[in-house]
Amino acid sequence: MSTDLVRFIADLSNRWRSRFSPSRPEHLRLGARGEKLACRFLRRSGYKVLYRNFRGRSGGEIDIVCRDKDTLVFVEVKTRTREDFGRPFDAIDRSKQKRIARGGLAWLRLLDDPDILFRFDVVEVIIVEDAQPRFELLRNAFALPEPYIY
């Protein structure tokens, strides 16, 4: 068995164990729940979900990769239990945008199609006790922070 395959299987196993571990911190469990709810919301909104939790080799990360008609969409999900400290979108600063952009560019490199249309969306998920989750979809929430080459 190749070393890359062994590494891939070990990484997958670690992710699986850590995702469902009962000792996982509350904020991580909340984030995972928000991503699951956001996937359902996006499907109901007509998006086709392609992948969850993509990590690029360059350190970039994408919560959800999906398609909206002919456009590839990289979605960042922000989940909160209240809005006392501003909207969830406010937590996406320039450095977070760069990390998301690196993940998106890593995905585009895998496709090897420089002419594909893409954008970055944000889904805000507000989960309040004893109420239905609330969703806000911000299409084209931000642009690439700098010119890109892939």
Annotate each PLM feature.
Residues 25, 29, 33, 59, ...:
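Residues at secondary-structure transition points
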